[in-house]
Curated annotation (Swiss-Prot):
<dbReference type="InterPro" id="IPR022669">
    <property type="entry name" value="Ribosomal_uL2_C"/>
</dbReference>
<dbReference type="InterPro" id="IPR014726">
    <property type="entry name" value="Ribosomal_uL2_dom3"/>
</dbReference>
<dbReference type="InterPro" id="IPR005880">
    <property type="entry name" value="Ribosomal_uL2_bac/org-type"/>
</dbReference>
<keyword id="KW-0694">RNA-binding</keyword>
<dbReference type="Pfam" id="PF03947">
    <property type="entry name" value="Ribosomal_L2_C"/>
</dbReference>
<dbReference type="GO" id="GO:0016740">
    <property type="term" value="F:transferase activity"/>
</dbReference>
<dbReference type="InterPro" id="IPR022666">
    <property type="entry name" value="Ribosomal_uL2_RNA-bd_dom"/>
</dbReference>
<dbReference type="Pfam" id="PF00181">
    <property type="entry name" value="Ribosomal_L2"/>
</dbReference>
<dbReference type="GO" id="GO:0019843">
    <property type="term" value="F:rRNA binding"/>
</dbReference>
<dbReference type="GO" id="GO:0003735">
    <property type="term" value="F:structural constituent of ribosome"/>
</dbReference>
<keyword id="KW-0699">rRNA-binding</keyword>
<comment type="function">
    <text>One of the primary rRNA binding proteins. Required for association of the 30S and 50S subunits to form the 70S ribosome, for tRNA binding and peptide bond formation. It has been suggested to have peptidyltransferase activity; this is somewhat controversial. Makes several contacts with the 16S rRNA in the 70S ribosome.</text>
</comment>
<dbReference type="GO" id="GO:0015934">
    <property type="term" value="C:large ribosomal subunit"/>
</dbReference>
<comment type="subunit">
    <text>Part of the 50S ribosomal subunit. Forms a bridge to the 30S subunit in the 70S ribosome.</text>
</comment>
<dbReference type="InterPro" id="IPR012340">
    <property type="entry name" value="NA-bd_OB-fold"/>
</dbReference>
<feature type="compositionally biased region" description="Basic and acidic residues">
    <location>
        <begin position="230"/>
        <end position="240"/>
    </location>
</feature>
<dbReference type="InterPro" id="IPR022671">
    <property type="entry name" value="Ribosomal_uL2_CS"/>
</dbReference>
Length: 276
């Protein structure tokens, strides 16, 4: 997929880059798989901001994605490759032989006309197929990995993401994530073969503030530009710094301090990500 540049008709367009849409099929989405999600804009049920720098953004419809991939024994044909406003990878519309249609994440190399299937075992190792981890050969690249059998894929779903199956141990398999982390996952969990497509997403330049506003991202004010009552970095004469190590608005260390809480799943992490 090619990176697209724009002529600088205005100063804001000079550095903008985007992704070409040549891989997208020119046909409307399946209406039965579209649903309207409420825009919370970072507010809770009381209307108070619980997640800063968020807004509704441009209007969009959510595509219902089949993350579970448990339609066993029925082959499907890729009918279309579509844009999804809620995620940074493309999605593929699968038309199954029994007449049902579902969306899945498009892995790299999957195109219109390809045949995909899901089963517990016995499928070809090709992009788009899905099997239980215990039946996938060691060394295979996978994505959309479940953490609990039957719950649906929770890991490795964004553009260009992948993991490699490194080994098998009784009821667990060992995955190496793109970050370098090695972790165990239950062997009964499902996973899709291949790497998530649209890997060029990481190389685009947003280029202007308005483009982030369309995505629902509001501006972020520096703490040093606030008053002392609003932020630990606030106050002072001119652009004077706060004289302390960088902290969040609530006084917790930032810029590298570890904030991850201990949880029961820590025992499944064999080695942490690179450099950590």
């Amino acid at each position: 997929m090619a990176i697209k540049t724009y002529k600088p008709y205005t100063p804001s367009r000079r550095y903008i880059t985007g992704l070409s849409s040549e891989d997208i099929t020119a046909k409307p989405s399946v209406r039965s798989l579209l649903v309207k999600l409420p825009a919370h804009a970072g507010r809770n049920s009381y209307g108070r901001i619980t997640s800063r720098h968020k807004e509704a953004g441009a209007k969009k419809l959510y595509r219902i994605i089949d993350f579970k991939r448990r339609k066993f024994g029925i082959e499907g044909k890729v009918e279309a490759i579509e844009y999804d406003p809620y995620r940074n990878c493309r999605i593929a519309l699968i038309a199954y032989k029994d007449g049902e249609k579902r969306y899945i994440l498009q892995p790299r190399g999957l195109s219109v006309g390809d045949i995909v299937a899901a089963a517990e075992s016995g499928l070809d190792i090709k992009p788009g197929n899905a099997m239980k981890l215990k039946n996938i050969p060691v060394g295979t690249i996978v994505h959309n990995v479940e953490l609990k059998p039957g719950k649906g894929g929770q890991m490795i779903r964004s553009a260009g993401a992948y993991a490699q199956l490194m080994g098998k141990e009784e009821k667990y398999v060992i995955l190496r994530l793109a970050s370098g982390e090695m972790r165990q996952v239950l062997a009964e969990c499902m996973a899709s073969i291949g790497e998530v497509g649209n890997e060029e997403w990481a190389n685009i330049t947003i280029g202007k503030a308005g483009r982030n506003r369309h995505r629902g991202i509001r501006p972020q004010t520096r703490g040093s530009a606030m008053n002392p009552v609003d932020h630990p970095h606030g106050g002072g004469e001119g652009k004077k710094n706060s004289g302390r190590h960088p902290v969040t608005p609530w006084g917790k260390p930032t810029k590298g301090a570890k904030t991850r809480c201990k949880k029961a799943s820590d025992k499944l992490i064999i080695s942490r990500r690179k450099g950590k």
